[in-house]
Structures are given as C-alpha cells and as structure tokens.
C-alpha cells in the first residue's frame, strides 16, 4: 500500500484497466485521464472513461513523432471546447499554452483548469518566474 491519492493516466489504458485501478485506489483516490487532440478528434474517445475518472486532461499530440505531452504545440481549440462542454467531469486544457495565448484559450474552451510546461521554462530548462507569473496573471484575467 502507498499513500498515493491522485494518479494521472496518459492513454493506452483500456476502460477495464482504469476500472480495476479505480477499485484498487480506494474511495479517497482520484484518477485523471489524459487524452490527446489529433486533428478534429480526441484520442482515445473520452466517453468510456467518464464514469471511471474524476477529471480529464486534453493535451496535444505531435502527428509526426507521435509524442504526447510536452510538445509545445497547440491543437484545435474547437475540439477541446466541444469536449469541455460535453464532459461531466472537470476538464483541464494543456498543449502549447503560453502567457500570450492562455487567456484566449480559456475564453474559447472554458476548461476547469489549464496546464503548461515547456512555454514556462527558461533557456536553462528550469521554470522561469517571470513567465510563470505572466501565465497565472493572464489566466486569472481571462474572464
């Protein structure tokens, strides 16, 4: 047993596997399922997971390399907006979010939360305080 309370799954898990994990996690545990926007679709489809998870995260996928997450690429926010509107669980938007585009992304998609990584790093690869501050300020002022 561990004291892990939240697990974020990054695709590749079947609904049956997620259900088994949910059963073993216990009542205090939280599951976040990450899916990816590729073109005009979310992959994998989120509907089979809604009853099994506490939240979903939508991120970008690099079509050429197959890399998911941390690509610094945006995706079609119309797809994310439709997913957010249909989701019965909180949806976090990720994928190429920067201090310059986060407010527009929030206004367009209306996610529960936003997630950023690569665009907030300085030249040395560590988080840049000024970029993080600008990101949070712009996210808060999006409404």
Write out the residue ranges for each language-model feature.
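Proline-aspartate-enriched helix->loop->beta-strand connector
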Residues: 4, 111-114
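Glycine-centered flexibility sites
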Residues: 11-12, 69-72, 95-96, 113, ...
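C-terminal helical cap(s) of enzyme catalytic domains, especially alpha/beta-barrels
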Residues: 20-22, 106-107, 117-143
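Short, structured secondary-structure boundary patches
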Residues: 29-31, 114-117
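A C-terminal functional module that forms or caps the active site or interfaces directly
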Residues: 91-107, 121
């Amino acid at each position: 047993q561990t004291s892990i309370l939240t697990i974020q799954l990054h695709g590749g898990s079947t609904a049956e596997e997620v259900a088994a994990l949910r059963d073993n996690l216990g009542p205090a545990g939280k599951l976040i399922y990450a899916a990816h926007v590729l073109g005009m679709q979310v992959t994998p489809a989120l509907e089979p997971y809604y009853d099994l998870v506490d939240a979903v995260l939508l991120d970008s996928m690099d079509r050429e390399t197959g890399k998911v997450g941390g690509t610094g690429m945006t995706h079609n926010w119309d797809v994310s907006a439709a997913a957010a509107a249909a989701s019965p669980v909180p949806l976090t938007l990720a994928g190429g979010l920067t201090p310059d585009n986060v407010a527009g992304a929030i206004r367009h998609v209306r996610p529960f939360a936003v997630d950023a990584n690569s665009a907030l790093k300085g030249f040395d690869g560590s988080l840049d305080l000024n970029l993080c501050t600008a990101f949070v300020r712009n996210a808060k002022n999006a409404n």
